Design a protein with these regions (language model features):
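Alpha-helix N-capping/helix-start residues
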Residues: 33, 66, 159, 236-239, ...
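Catalytic alpha/beta core domains of metabolic enzymes, predominantly
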Residues: 137-140, 150-253, 257-261
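A general structural signal for well-ordered alpha-helical segments in protein cores
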Residues: 36, 73, 98, 132, ...
């Protein structure tokens, strides 16, 4: 079984690659398996990302049919070929469905499952903790990564709760970006050796110094080199360079007007992936069929800004994987 020691570096959050007609509300087979395989192979083979995850918010778990989700799992497992750890997102409205989907991912060959709490009704902290313990018991040989997203899932898991969560040895990681530095230090003191904590790419300075295993990023699908250089700087303890890159990465959210609508927060970046040209994520799925012009404009600005960062921080092949 995968452990926290196996998880570090850059965690790429994958889009659910869409066929050209995948934005139709009557479409039933919208996974572009060919482009998925090409993009995954390029990202792993050329850049040195260390972990791959699917079907989070950016990964569009909320717009897929279960049949499509299964196709995506199968295509991703086949593309990754065990070169890096693969965690399949199975966040759902109820624990039984999440566990059913996670079992399929495990049987298909995924190393772990990425899970947010069931979110239709706001969970209590006690029930959020119990949810992860129940999943760990149901999947004792599968790694569990907590997808901590209070904005979408409407519950913040307090640091102290991880004393109980880490009693389960197969809860091995967390995607997070919602802790103050002091909270993060306390979190790492509790989870050290048991869970790898991945922070947002813009938090690598100073959180890597405080105990983060690495960072998560969906911007890498526009070209991974800025994030690879950031990880390399952190590993080398070149904090001035790390600080500078983090500031540049933070600028990606400031190149256009703040749209102020949560539904476009991840969707605009999928459109930006298409504009950047590193790979083709495809169109947005229904219900995102009416796209405001400001969202389209923002996606173009984001892509142009990111391409400038890729020129500023060119790829140094395999630096991240060999050093992480």
């Amino acid at each position: 079984m995968i452990t926290a020691d196996d998880l570090n570096g850059i965690m790429a959050m994958m889009p659910a690659f869409t066929t050209a007609d995948g934005n139709r509300p009557d479409a039933t087979a919208t996974i572009d398996s060919d482009e998925l395989a090409r993009a995954v192979n390029k990202l792993i083979g050329d850049s040195g990302v260390n972990v791959l995850t699917t079907t989070g918010s950016f990964g569009e778990f909320h717009t897929l049919l279960w049949e499509e989700h299964k196709s995506l799992i199968e295509a991703t497992v086949a593309a990754v070929k065990k070169r890096v750890p693969l965690f399949v997102g199975c966040t759902n409205l109820n624990p039984r469905e999440a566990i059913r989907q996670a079992k399929f991912a495990q049987e298909t060959g995924a190393d772990g499952v990425l899970l947010g709490v069931p979110f239709y009704y706001q969970a209590t902290v006690d029930n959020a903790v119990q949810f992860y313990r129940d999943v760990a018991d149901a999947l004792p040989k599968m790694g569990v990564m907590i997808y901590h997203n209070p904005t979408h899932h409407r519950v913040t898991i307090p640091v102290g709760a991880f004393k109980k969560i880490t009693e389960k040895p197969n809860i091995v990681a967390m995607k997070d970006s919602h802790r103050t530095p002091l909270q993060f230090v306390e979190l790492c003191n509790i989870t050290k050796g048991k869970m790898s904590i991945f922070v947002n790419q813009t938090q690598m300075f100073p959180y890597y110094q405080l105990g983060a295993a690495g960072c998560w990023s969906f911007n890498v699908w526009m070209g991974p080199s800025p994030v690879i250089n950031l990880l390399g700087a952190c590993i080398a303890r070149d904090w001035e360079t790390a600080k500078r890159i983090c500031l540049d990465l933070d600028g990606v959210g400031k190149v256009g007007p703040n749209i102020g609508n949560l539904s476009w927060r991840e969707n605009v970046f999928k459109l930006a992936v298409n504009e950047a040209g590193y790979c083709t994520a495809g169109p947005l799925r229904a219900p995102w069929r009416v796209i405001p012009q400001e969202v389209t404009d923002n996606s173009k600005k984001i892509a142009a800004y990111w391409k400038e960062l890729c020129e500023k921080y060119p790829l140094q092949k395999d630096r991240a994987r060999k050093s992480a």
